[in-house]
């Protein structure tokens, strides 16, 4: 097959992929041409070491700016995506400095004639798929090769061996033990690489048939998941004098202690970066620092070091976050303050547009390999054209094919003003319908020397498109706990991905105003060719569900172990004894699950990756990992059993310590605390139940003769023993958490937590008053019925209106008496009230729970419930047929203290029940534990045919939306109480597979899953917790509408309180 125009560009150097160093530089002068003596005075030769270790000589004028040299280098290499690269040199202090384009070289480089500058990657994008040129990815792979050798890219021995094996495949071709050993003996990839020799050879055997382009992509794909990917340390110290390392990445400024990341200051949180002498200053936005200091200070070694790091931060921020370079400030007439430095190159957005629009003619280049061997697999396979598919794993197919692939990096965030204020998150990679089609060919590999080989070409499959995910780590607003609790494991398994289509024509859809910066993938509405490379075994999808939910679970634990701990340490608000009790019981659990997640990620990577096609199925299982870890969980039973003690002591401490109470309330208002704080204390025990359910599905899927069945069955037995032992503890813990949450949210009530009191149901009913039917929030407990009204002061708390003891209570239907649909009468010892439910099913659920609770209350002692601080009704007893018409309550009476609570979260079940006119029972909350799910979904834009990729977490009857699974807090939420889930109808014009529809009144959303299994799982869990938890299917139509008679009495409420997806979209 002949060479395809525009695929390869000729490397004008003699450097090879083997990395052999060239002893002499190559001049840019023509052969036999020399400079005249006069010209030699006006020119100087500068040596530049390229990424393949060859040295080039460039002739420039002594007083020219750095941009002149850079332009010569880019032209010499025919490098299109040149803005990712730069030239660096060592200064007097022997640390590396980037050559500034707008400054004369002689003012930067000392003795430039003797200096050796080197080409290096300057900006590391979070995803290699954002690099559109194969040649650019090749240079990035060479940079990572250099970083490995210089020990900048620190990683485990296994990961280093895997990286080197892909570099070997790229440079010398398919595995040959003799040649591999000779090559590794002659070339150093890693210090002391002899220790990893056998691992390298073992990994290399698995890459048979992999082309150089695919190997490059695999190197980038593995490296970008390492915490040290693209990190360049700058030694510093904090205000206390602690030695730290500062670094900068696409996401913001990073703080390390040793090689452990302890803090991340995202660009969106930073208001301004500055330096003053040796001090580097980070000013945060007011909403980030809150009551804490708004300026963080770090001390570097010298003013030059500090200014150098500041310049790098400015360049990184401009390149990744802005659409265009900021305009230069006007020069001061008399005096100027501060540095005039600014980034002078193109931003990533501008570079993307330039390459997309054709920017520069692509000149073919050849990959010349010495001692390479022919890969029959790569040379014989030639599949038809296919569209890009977002699949899991290391995105290359086991069967290579020729493919038409369009890579399109992210759209930029909205234009920001010069400097650093008002920063917004940038989007991730998109597939653009108009992006140019790139066809790749692989140079023929032969067994002879490269000098005698002719460059024949063959179609090869480009690595798959990008998965959107930010750099590793999590952002923090304050100093962190011990570094041991923050160590990061290698994650080889990427997140769930969704199939995206490409088209040759048509404009990209417009991003929705909300979540536009969060979208991680976009699709056009044209017909899509499907070609997904992922295992089809249901066990694989169950394993991937374990991975996805484990990632969410670990993030939930970090809310306490990292974020809450950080605030407590900073404020010194918690007694030492309570702090020891809290973290001694949750830290070991957190560390265990970090290790477990690491194992699952690596297993899934091997299961999904291209190497799995050459194995005998040893890695296409998960039971051995589950069995080992489920058995270890037994050792943590004592920790799980003490969580109710932790919750009780925490509640007592907040009552007696005003400072702790203030810190607690303030922390709950932070975005990272997306659920009530005490809810996260339930997660460890609830996760055990989830393991049991997942293992049950695995055992049901496998036949008894399957190699993984025995391990899964034993793991199920082990976790069942643990959950059985902890069942009473979980029930007690869930009840205690609910009572604690209600006591915090209800105004005018104290001592709600009482021995023997159990929560039964909460929900919205309409109470008959002198004004007619008034909406009230009712709470049914094992000893009383409590009802509240929403505050009219703008706060989202509920104020106690009254309570009725269950002893002696009687409940009767009274629709005929009052002519109000779905109403019933509650007769208490001293009061009678008439209430109406929104539907027949709601009425039946309330009456059933009330009657059951009344019967159970007969066995409780005679002591009345104690509720201090709320209005207790002590009116004269009335006859059983007399109805109490509630006074005009909304205009008078003490409202209680609500200061500081106006921002209270509005997606709790209490608030959602209020707005959706529904109710939730204790059984529903317990069932919700079994209906938790995480993963990537595509959300359809409202006003276009585009799809937006989001990480979605379903918990506590609510969908939470993130850009990626590594985000610390959700961008939006959608409570699902009251929603119905169904398949799209023909009128919806949705022509995609695995799409489900969510609807509540006029609010309609479409979501798309990546496979049949995930589609069915999302449908299943949402059905169980949508319109009304626990609803029988036969009641679907009856419950979805209010009764006509009641509509006149009930004012239509907004579907969902802000913040939520309803209101924003």
From Swiss-Prot:
What the entry lists under CDD domains is as follows:
FERM_B-lobe, FERM_C_FARP1-like, FERM_F1_FARP2, PH1_FARP1-like, PH2_FARP1-like, RhoGEF
For the DH domain, which residue ranges apply?
538-729
Q: By its UniProt entry, which SMART domains does this protein fall under?
A: B41, FA, FERM_C, PH, RhoGEF
Q: Which domain of life is it from?
A: Eukaryota
Q: What one GO molecular function would you report for this record? A: guanyl-nucleotide exchange factor activity
Q: Where is the composition biased (Low complexity)?
A: 440-459
Cite the residue spans of the region called Disordered. 406-489, 504-534, 874-902
Q: Repeat: is it a keyword of this entry?
A: yes
* A GO CC term attached to the entry: cytoplasm
- Entries under Pfam families matching the protein: FA (PF08736), FERM_C (PF09380), FERM_M (PF00373), FERM_N (PF09379), PH (PF00169), RhoGEF (PF00621)
Summarize the record's induction comment. Answer: Up-regulated by TNFSF11.
The protein's assembly and partners: Interacts with PLXNA1. Interaction with PLXNA1 or PIP5K1C lowers its guanine nucleotide exchange activity. Dissociates from PLXNA1 when SEMA3A binds to the receptor. Interacts with PIP5K1C via its FERM domain. The interaction with PIP5K1C is enhanced by SEMA3A binding. Interacts with RAC1.
Q: Which PANTHER family match?
A: FERM DOMAIN CONTAINING PROTEIN, FERM, ARHGEF AND PLECKSTRIN DOMAIN-CONTAINING PROTEIN 2
The role this protein plays is: Functions as a guanine nucleotide exchange factor that activates RAC1. May have relatively low activity. Plays a role in the response to class 3 semaphorins and remodeling of the actin cytoskeleton. Plays a role in TNFSF11-mediated osteoclast differentiation, especially in podosome rearrangement and reorganization of the actin cytoskeleton. Regulates the activation of ITGB3, integrin signaling and cell adhesion.
Q: Which protein, by its recorded name, is this?
A: FERM, ARHGEF and pleckstrin domain-containing protein 2
Q: Which organism is it from?
A: Mus musculus (Mouse)
């Amino acid at each position: 097959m002949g060479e395809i125009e525009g695929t390869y560009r000729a490397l004008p150097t003699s450097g090879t992929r083997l990395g052999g160093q060239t002893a002499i530089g190559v001049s840019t002068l023509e052969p036999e041409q020399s400079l005249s003596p006069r010209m030699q005075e006006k020119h100087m030769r500068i040596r530049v070491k390229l990424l393949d270790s060859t040295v080039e000589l460039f002739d420039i004028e002594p007083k020219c700016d750095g941009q002149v040299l850079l332009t010569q280098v880019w032209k010499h290499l025919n490098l299109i995506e040149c803005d990712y690269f730069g030239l660096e040199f060592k200064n007097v202090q022997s640390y590396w400095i980037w050559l500034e384009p707008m400054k004369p070289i002689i003012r930067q480089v000392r003795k430039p004639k003797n200096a050796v500058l080197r080409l290096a990657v300057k900006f590391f994008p979070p995803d290699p798929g954002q690099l559109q040129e194969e040649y650019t990815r090749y240079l990035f792979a060479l940079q990572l090769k250099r970083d490995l050798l210089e020990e900048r890219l620190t990683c485990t021995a296994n990961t280093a061996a895997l990286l080197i094996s892909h570099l070997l495949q790229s440079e010398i071709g398919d595995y040959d033990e003799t040649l591999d050993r000779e090559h590794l003996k002659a070339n150093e990839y890693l210090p002391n690489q002899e220790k990893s020799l056998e691992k390298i050879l073992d990994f290399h055997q698995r890459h048979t048939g992999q082309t150089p382009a695919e190997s490059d992509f695999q190197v980038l794909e593995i490296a970008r998941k390492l915490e040290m990917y693209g990190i360049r340390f700058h030694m510093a110290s904090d205000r206390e004098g602690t030695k730290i390392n500062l670094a900068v990445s696409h996401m913001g400024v990073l703080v390390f202690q040793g090689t452990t990341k302890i803090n991340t200051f995202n660009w969106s949180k930073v208001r301004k970066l500055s330096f003053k002498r040796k001090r580097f200053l980070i000013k945060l936005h007011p909403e980030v620092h809150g009551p804490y200091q708004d300026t963080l200070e770090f001390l570097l070694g010298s003013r030059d070091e500090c200014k150098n790091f500041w310049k790098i931060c400015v360049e990184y921020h401009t390149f990744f976050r802005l659409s265009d370079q900021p305009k230069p400030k006007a020069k001061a007439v008399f005096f100027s303050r501060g540095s005039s430095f600014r980034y002078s190159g193109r931003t990533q957005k501008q570079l993307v547009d330039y390459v997309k629009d054709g920017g520069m003619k692509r000149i073919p280049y050849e990959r010349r390999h010495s001692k390479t061997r022919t890969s029959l697999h790569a040379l014989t396979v030639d599949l038809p054209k296919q569209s890009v598919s977002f699949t899991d794993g290391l995105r290359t197919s086991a069967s290579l094919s020729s493919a038409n692939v369009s890579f399109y990096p992210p759209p930029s965030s909205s234009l920001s003003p010069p400097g650093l204020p008002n920063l917004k998150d940038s989007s991730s990679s998109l597939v653009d319908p108009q992006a140019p089609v790139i066809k790749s060919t692989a140079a023929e590999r032969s067994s002879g020397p490269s000098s005698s080989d002719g460059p024949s070409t063959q179609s090869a499959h480009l690595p798959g498109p990008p998965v959107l995910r930010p750099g590793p780590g999590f952002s923090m607003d304050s100093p962190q706990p011990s570094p041991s609790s923050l160590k990061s494991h290698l994650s080889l398994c990427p997140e769930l991905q969704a199939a995206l289509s490409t088209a040759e024509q048509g404009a990209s859809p417009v991003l929705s105003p909300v979540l536009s910066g969060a979208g991680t993938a976009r699709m056009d509405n044209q017909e899509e060719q499907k070609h997904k490379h992922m295992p089809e075994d249901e066990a694989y999808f169950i394993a991937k569900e374990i991975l996805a939910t484990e990632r969410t679970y670990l993030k939930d634990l970090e809310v306490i172990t990292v974020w809450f701990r950080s605030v407590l340490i900073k404020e010194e608000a918690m007694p030492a004894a309570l702090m020891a009790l809290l973290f001694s019981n949750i830290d070991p659990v957190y560390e265990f699950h970090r290790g477990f997640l690491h194992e699952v990620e690596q297993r899934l990577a091997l299961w999904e990756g291209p190497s799995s096609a050459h194995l005998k199925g040893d890695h296409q299982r998960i039971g051995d990992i589950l069995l080992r870890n489920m058995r270890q969980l037994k050792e943590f039973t004592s920790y799980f059993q003490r969580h109710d003690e932790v919750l009780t002591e925490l509640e007592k401490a907040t009552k007696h310590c005003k400072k702790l109470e203030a810190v607690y309330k303030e922390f709950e208002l932070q975005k990272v605390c997306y659920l009530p704080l005490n809810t996260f204390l339930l997660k460890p025990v609830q996760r055990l139940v989830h393991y049991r359910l997942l293992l049950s599905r695995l055992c049901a899927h496998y036949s008894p003769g399957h190699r993984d069945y025995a391990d899964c069955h034993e793991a199920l037995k082990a976790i069942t023993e643990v959950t059985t032992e902890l069942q009473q503890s979980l029930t007690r813990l869930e009840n205690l958490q609910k009572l604690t949450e209600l006591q915090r949210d209800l105004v005018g009530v104290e001592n709600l937590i009482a021995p023997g009191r159990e929560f039964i149901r909460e929900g919205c009913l309409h109470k008959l008053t002198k004004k007619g039917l008034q909406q009230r929030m009712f709470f049914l407990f094992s000893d009383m019925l409590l009802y509240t009204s929403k505050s009219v002061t703008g706060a989202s708390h509920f104020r106690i209106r009254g309570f009725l003891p269950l002893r002696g209570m009687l409940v009767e239907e009274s629709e005929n008496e009052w002519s109000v649909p779905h109403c019933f009468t509650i007769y208490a010892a001293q009061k009678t009230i008439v209430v109406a439910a929104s539907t027949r099913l709601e009425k039946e659920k309330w009456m059933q729970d009330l009657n059951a609770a009344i019967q159970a209350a007969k066995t409780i002692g005679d002591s009345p419930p104690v509720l201090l601080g709320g209005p207790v009704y002590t009116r004269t007893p009335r006859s059983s047929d007399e109805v109490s018409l509630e006074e005009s309550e909304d205009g008078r009476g003490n409202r209680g203290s609500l200061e500081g609570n106006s921002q209270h979260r509005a997606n709790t079940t209490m608030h959602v029940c209020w707005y959706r006119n529904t109710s939730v029972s204790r059984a529903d909350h317990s069932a919700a534990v079994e209906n938790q799910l995480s993963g990537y979904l595509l959300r359809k834009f409202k006003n276009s045919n585009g799809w937006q990729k989001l990480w979605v977490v379903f918990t506590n009857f609510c969908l939470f939306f993130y850009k990626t699974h590594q985000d610390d807090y959700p961008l939006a939420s959608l409570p699902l109480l009251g929603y119905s889930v169904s398949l799209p109808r023909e009128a919806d014009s949705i022509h995609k597979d695995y799409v489900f529809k969510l609807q509540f009144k006029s609010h309609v959303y479409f979501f798309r899953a990546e496979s049949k299994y995930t589609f069915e799982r999302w449908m299943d869990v949402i059905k169980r917790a949508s319109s009304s938890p626990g609803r029988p299917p036969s009641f679907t139509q009856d419950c979805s509408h209010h009764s006509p008679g009641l509509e006149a009495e009930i004012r239509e409420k907004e579907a969902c309180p802000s913040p939520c997806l309803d209101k924003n979209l």
